[in-house]
Amino acid sequence: MKNTLFCLLAASFAASASLCADAPTVCSAGGKDDMVPGAPPAAQAPATAAPAASRFIYGTPGEEYPPYGELPKELWPFANTEPYYRYFVTRMPFRGPGRDYAPESDLRSLKIGLVDAPKVGPNWERSVRTREGIVLAIEEANIERRPGELPFDLIEHEGIAQWGGAANLAALLADEKVLGYLGTIDGTDAHVALRVTLKTEIVMVNTSDPDQTLTETQIPWLIRVLPDHRQEEGRLAELMVRKCGCTRIAVLRTGDRFARVGAHQFADFARRLGSPVVQELLFSPGATDISYQIAAIKESQPDAIFFLGEPTDIGRFAKQFREAGIKARFFGTDLLMEDGFLKNAGDAAEGTTFTFYSDPDRQDPLWTEFRARFKNRWGHEPDAYAAYAYDGAEILLHAMRIAGPNRWRIRDEVYNLDYYQGVTGWMRFDGTGSNTAPVRIVRYEAGRRVFEPQGEFAPPTTTGKLTSSP
C-alpha cells in the first residue's frame, strides 16, 4: 500500500512540476547575499555510502511505540505501577483535508523556510553553523534534481529577540508559501512557532532544541532530529548514581528554558534512582563572581556537580570551584563539547564527563563523506548543529521529492518516519516524533575528549516496515 501510494504521489508530482532554469535564491543568515569559503558542490559526486531508499524506514498509522523516550523503565513516571492510560505511545493523526489539493499553477520552485536565531548571544553562532548544513543540503539537492523537477529555494528570516517573535516569522513563512521549514534553536521560540504551525499546517523539522516537551504537545506537524533532554539527562543520572555511586548531587544552572527544563528532568531521574538533588543554584550568564554559589555548594558537600549553561561560563566556574577546594566530580551536557569550556577551565576540565551525540572521528562513510564535502564548501569542520541541520534538511527534501508540492502529503512523509540513517547516524523516532537514539558519554582526559566505547545504534534488521525511494 505504501509503495502504491508513493508511485501515485511521484506521478502526480512529475506531472505538476515544470523545469525552471533560474538558480534558487539562497540568503545568508540575516537576509543578505553571502560569499562564503569554498565553492558550491556543483562538480561533486553525490554520496555513495548508502542507497537513499534504505535510509528511510516508515511506520504505520496507529502503531504503538515504547513510552517515555525508550528510557529504562526505572526512569519512567509511574514505573512501579501500571497507570490507567499512557500518553505518547501512538502518533497523533491528521484528519483534515489537503492531501488532494492541486498545486499552484505558477509554481516555479519548492520553498523551504528557515528561522535563524537573533543576532545576539551565543545561539547566533550556532545558528550560522545550522544554516551552513541546511544550505549544503539544498545545494546538493538542486544539483541532483532530475529533468522536469522544480528547484528548491531557501526562504530565511533572522530571529526576533523578543518573546513571541517566532510566531510572526512562522506566519510570515506561511504567507511566503513555504512547504516546510526548519528551526529554531531556542526552546521558547520553537514552542511559540509550533502553535502557529498548528494553524498554518506547514510541517516543522526541529534540528537543535532538546526540550522534550516540544514534541509532547502532540501537534502532528513536527519532528525533532536532535536527541532530547531525556536521552542526555537520563544517561547522566544513571552514570552518576549507578556507576559512579554519587549520592549528593548539586546542580548549577542558568535561568533560561534550556537549563530549567534540563535541570527539572535530571532531578526527576536522580530522585527515581534514589539520589535526590541536594541543592540547585542559579547563575547569570556571563557572571564572573559566583562566590555565593561556591560557598553554598561547598557547604552542601556534594560528590557530583551537574552544570547547565554556556560552556564559557561553566569552564570559568569549574576553575573557580577547583581553586576553592571543591573536589566533586563535574558533569554536563553536549555544550561542553565546545572549545569555550576547555579554554576557560584549563586543568580543571580534567575528568569532566558529559554527553554528546556521536564521535566526530568515527569512520562511518556517510559521516566522512559529509565531513569532507562540508569542509570543502565552508572551509571548516562541521559541528553537531551543522550535522543535525543537514540531516533535518535531508528528511524534508526527501519528503518533498516523494510528496510533491503538497504540504499535507509532505507532512505525512515526515511525520510517519520511524528510522532514518543520516550523517549523524541512525535516528529512531518515538510516538511524539522525537529522536530517541542513544547518546554517548565523553570525558576530558589530559585536554582531550575521550569517548566511552559504545556500539553504533542501528534499527532491528527485521522491522517489517517499508522504505521509500527518492
Which residue stretches match the model-derived regions?
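Positively charged n-region of N-terminal signal peptides that target proteins for export
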Residues: M1-T4
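Extracytosolic ligand-binding ectodomains
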Residues: F6-A10, A17-P470
